[in-house]
A protein has these predicted regions:
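Catalytic-core regions of core metabolic enzymes
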Residues: 1-499
Length: 499
């Protein structure tokens, strides 16, 4: 067996997790050819995801699966196994785990359910598996988990066939179902993932252990958690407080109500503490607690893509007046300040706009068709030391409205040149691409976030990646989403400044 330290890993739980999340060899125990079975879904996902290491199907029937030789027992595999993904029935797990121990498997992801979440008999079996694993120094994730996704290692060992792109957001979820749904949505929104773990019942490895691993993981910059219970609350707070100083932790606590507590008890076998106590502990540790899954995605997009604001002063640039008014109200309600703009900015912006423009913050562009004015207004705010962040409203998204206009004109006015209409569409599309690229450049230059709201719903996602840039523009659907994200980023900045 090779030495973990020879592969660049330290010793302890974090080292064992590093081996699991960066394996060279993976065995799927309970592999199957029956579409829809866990053993088939996980094996096909690993192979379709182009895992660069070696994959070994293990099935009592032998034969071939997905074009690979299948082994009747894990001991029949001649090579060392870093990771075993186990989908065998709960009743067969004692024998399977014993065989993994004898083989010297580094660690297991136990997909199988029917343990502590199912009652006393399941709890005893779960404890027995933990004892067997500890005795062999073999780490166990789960049981009752959806699996793991490790994009940087090219490993997608989950029943759900979402294979997110590489990124800096790590997600630990006690619910595999909720976790994989959010991973799928994150991929659609352009949010790259460093790691996903369905932690399941956390019989051996707890959320605190994952945080300790992620603290030194070079691929991870932001951590999101979905938790239904906390094992060893004191350790969780100590670890999360330390990790949160360098990597923001965003947490959604399930089971905040009596109905939710009952549902999660039968779901993961969770035992709950007081919601108020958990919330107070999170605030003490500086964690960002949210109340909805969508907030996890909104905040992970911002924290992984934008520079952190250094204060709570906001400049607002809006294509039209109404959104600016609403956004200013929401900023004040969230503790964000809207400072008056100095005379030099008034003069600069005034040279581009008609005399009836607002001459104040928010800067109302009065629906200007001059494509340079939004860029000038945003940069004037960024250059000024009186604001810490900019919210841009309705600059991007006009292309979709132009498309609708062109479609209408094509239908009702045959005298308008088709090439002219195509040029209008092309010009609006290229302007928005240029605007997005310019926002990335401005954030890199001034180290201040620009948070945008799209005028219309787009299919391009929240994060617009710009190759080779340190920051990437983000676009939300509503002003309240943008304001909430900025307020949470300011909250985290203030925590870091105090700690």
């Amino acid at each position: 067996m090779d030495n973990l330290q020879d592969r660049g890993f330290s010793t302890g739980t974090a080292a064992s997790l590093a081996c699991l999340f960066n394996p060279r060899t993976v065995a799927v125990i309970g592999a199957s050819s029956v579409i829809g079975k866990w053993g088939q879904m996980i094996l096909s996902n690993i192979l379709a995801g182009r895992f660069p290491g070696k994959t070994f199907p293990v099935n009592s029937g032998g034969g071939t699966l997905c074009g690979l030789n299948s082994y009747r027992r894990i001991q029949d595999v001649t090579e060392p196994i870093d990771l075993a993904v186990i989908t065998a029935p709960a009743g067969a797990l004692r024998e399977v785990v014993n065989e993994c121990c004898e083989k010297g498997v580094r660690g297991m992801v136990v997909i199988t359910s029917g343990f502590s979440e199912a009652g006393e008999e399941g709890r005893r079996l779960e404890e027995e598996l933990v004892s067997l694993s500890r005795a062999s120094q073999m780490i166990m994730i789960g049981p009752n988990t959806m699996g793991i996704l490790c994009p940087h290692a090219g490993l997608f060992a989950s029943g759900a066939h979402s294979r997110p792109g590489k990124g800096t957001v790590a997600f630990v979820s006690q619910s595999g179902n909720l976790g994989t749904q959010l991973i799928h949505w994150a991929d659609q929104q352009g949010i790259g993932i460093s790691l996903f773990v369905g932690s399941g019942n956390e019989a051996m490895v707890t959320c605190s252990d994952y945080l300790e691993y992620l603290e030194s993981d070079p691929h991870t910059g932001t951590i999101i958690l979905y938790m239904e219970s906390v094992k060893d609350g004191r350790r969780f707070i100590e670890v999360s407080r330390r990790v949160n100083r360098s990597k923001p932790i965003i947490v959604l606590k399930g089971g905040r109500t009596e109905a939710g507590k009952g549902a999660s008890a039968s779901h993961t076998g969770a035992m709950h503490g007081e919601t108020a106590v958990f919330g107070a502990a999170c605030r003490q540790a500086g964690l960002i607690e949210v109340s909805a899954p969508s907030e996890l995605l909104d905040l992970s997009a911002a924290f992984s893509s934008l520079p952190l604001p250094r204060g709570n002063r906001v400049g607002i640039v809006t294509l039209g007046g109404g959104w600016g008014v609403v956004t200013a109200d929401q900023c004040n309600e969230k503790g964000l300040l809207i400072p008056d703009i100095p005379d030099n900015i008034v003069r600069t912006i005034g040279s581009f706009l008609p005399p009836f423009w607002s001459r104040r913050n928010p800067i109302d562009l009065v629906g200007t068709k001059d494509l340079q004015v939004p860029l000038v207004a945003v940069e004037e705010f960024l250059k000024w030391d009186g604001v810490d962040a900019v919210i841009s409203l309705g600059i991007v998204g006009r292309h979709e409205l132009v498309q609708l206009l062109v479609q209408s004109v094509r239908e009702v006015d045959p005298d308008v040149s088709s090439s002219h209409l195509s040029q209008l569409e092309s010009a609006s599309r290229e302007y928005e691409k240029a605007y997005v690229a310019r926002m990335a450049d401005l954030m890199a230059e001034y180290r201040k976030p620009v948070i945008s709201v799209s005028l219309a719903r787009t299919q391009e996602g929240t994060v617009r990646h710009q190759q080779g840039k340190p920051y990437h523009p983000v676009f939300y659907q509503t002003p309240e989403d943008a304001v909430n994200v900025l307020a949470r980023m300011v909250q985290y900045h203030e925590y870091k400044a105090r700690s």
